[in-house]
């Protein structure tokens, strides 16, 4: 069976990149608020024995978002975690994310139109033009940020506004 062909022009890929990166820039601010809301003394909170701790989930969210952007820029996906040293506390994690996520987005912004259209293997599961993986970063971030936001109130924290107000941070439209 041959790989599916994608009718993707370089011009469309550039426009799609800019649209997706603008959205990711907005998501960065929301994710940073959720990360910063983790109570330092409750990092080991785990809602279920099968669940990750709040800290494990937060580091996975932050580091994998950045790693995926870096892998898009490199046009190569690897299973090995890129970032070995975790930040030491919640404030450092939020700052790490705020520093690394935009610089990784800048690397993606520098890809040529032709590079954006180049098919890249995704962990040996399938291959798509590299531009399409930006939506994976967005989905990954939203998925794990949603999980983490459900940990906040049971940990004694406040849930920030995400896509509208929360009981703790009402929308001020």
Regions found by a protein language model. Name each.
Residues 38-41, 109-111:
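Short, solvent-exposed, charged loop/turn and helix-capping segments
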Residues 9-18:
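Short, low-complexity N-terminal intrinsically disordered segments enriched in polar/charged residues
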Residues 70-111:
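Helix-adjacent hinge/juxtasegments
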């Amino acid at each position: 069976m041959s790989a599916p062909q994608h009718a993707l022009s370089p011009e469309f890929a550039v426009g799609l990149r800019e649209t997706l990166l603008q959205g990711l820039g907005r998501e960065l601010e929301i994710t940073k608020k959720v990360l910063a809301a983790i109570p330092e003394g409750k990092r080991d909170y785990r809602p279920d024995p099968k669940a990750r701790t709040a800290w494990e989930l937060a580091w996975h969210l932050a580091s994998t978002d950045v790693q995926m952007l870096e892998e898009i820029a490199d046009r190569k996906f690897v299973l090995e975690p890129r970032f070995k040293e975790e930040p030491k506390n919640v404030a450092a994690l939020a700052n790490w994310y705020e520093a690394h996520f935009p610089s990784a987005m800048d690397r993606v912004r520098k890809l040529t139109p032709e590079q954006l259209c180049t098919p890249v293997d995704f962990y040996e599961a399938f291959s798509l033009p590299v531009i399409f993986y930006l939506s994976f970063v967005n989905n990954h971030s939203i998925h794990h940020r949603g999980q983490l936001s459900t940990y906040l109130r049971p940990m004694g924290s406040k849930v920030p506004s995400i896509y509208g107000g929360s009981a703790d941070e009402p929308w001020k439209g």
